Amino acid sequence: MMKAFKKLAIISDCVHFISPNGIAATENHIFLRQMEVLAKHFSHTIICCPFVEFSDNKIYTEYTGAIEFYATPNVGGNKVSDKLTILKTIPAWLKVFKKIKRQADCFYLRFPDNLNIPGFFYFNFTKKILFASYAGTWKNYPGEPSTYRFQKYLLKHFFKGPVFAYLEKDEPKYHLYKTFSPSYFQETWEEESENVALKINGLHEGKKDIPVFISVGAFNAQKNQQFILEALKILHEKDIDFKCYLVGDGPLKQQYAAFIAGNSLTGKIFLMGKLKANDLRMLYRKSDFLIQASLIEGYGKVPVEGYFHGVIPFLHKTQMTNVILDNGKCGFAFEANDPVIFAQFLMETIQQKSLLAEKIIAGRNFSKGLTLEKWSARIVETVQNFYER
């Protein structure tokens, strides 16, 4: 545990706003939960982040803890004009950095975040306690933005504090430590025990219910929901009954809606839009299988959420898939190359009731170590040990 007097400042690009209730809020409820549980280890916490105007279409969560906020400009994008805008806002960020430097003695820099590049140089040469995280794919990949690679290079070779990243194992030589991205508390795990037991009993009894699939993520090419739609179309053409919930929103929503309508799938595949955390939990409870076909992924939080609810994941093979599946104990990996092959694999696998029950039990046991409490405790313990050595 960090000493009680430690005051934490978090620098992030997570967009916030003030809700109609006059309370700081964000659409990224996972970020909110993680920062609130981390803040419990400190006497006071500041979050330095962009603020925008509130709009009625936002699906948001309000903060409940006593966290102080410093607003910064909301900028970003990949166009040259976007980069120039970012450069123009650096003085405003530096002004905020100067303020929080006087108020906190421990600083948490979250990457990837272009505006944390000046944050890196500003704080890395102070005598303050520092730690950072990189919430993206750590290994380089084709098409990766050059600024992402630059940030990883800085963190690995020059950052003076511990860095938490999605790794298969710790790399103390480079002060890199593996982490994960939790959504739920231990209490949530306990709450789902009865519902999960019913799922397992149903498998043991050989019940032939309609399989229910779920996939969660932004509707874009990287998340690759089109591959899932193609595979489910094949199941439909083979007269296999099922339901599938696609949760999210994004630029490909209309394309997906047209595909569903054009292939007579409107009674089987449902576009759910963005959901509040509790509404998503209700869908997980109804679901049997999770399909994530993301082409690039860090430590996907969605499969872990599935484990809590007894949902068995099918994950496209990416850098961390083997770790997330606990070496295949908790789910199944596939190559998102040919929807015909995947559809056949899916049809064969979901019939193996005993195997599926084993996967649910393994996922539940695995997820016990992936709670918000475990995540925050590991960070605090690692930071303390790092600076006391």
Region roles according to the model:
Residues I100-K101, K274-L275, M282-S287:
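Short alpha-helical donor nucleotide-sugar binding micro-motif in glycosyltransferases
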Residues K199-K223, L229-L232:
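Conserved donor-binding/catalytic core segment of Leloir-type glycosyltransferases
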Residues A257-L275:
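Nucleotide-activated donor-binding/catalytic signature segment of Leloir-type glycosyltransferases, i.e.
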Residues L265, I341, E348, L355-G369, ...:
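A short, well-ordered alpha-helix in the C-terminal region of glycosyltransferases
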Residues L295:
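Aromatic "clamp/platform" in nucleotide-sugar-dependent glycosyltransferases that forms part
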Residues G300-P303, T321:
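Short glycine/serine-rich donor-binding loops of glycosyltransferases
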Residues I312-L315:
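Short hydrophobic beta-strand element within catalytic cores of glycosyltransferases
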Residues N327-G328, F332-P339, E348-K353:
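Conserved acidic donor-binding segment of nucleotide-sugar-dependent glycosyltransferases
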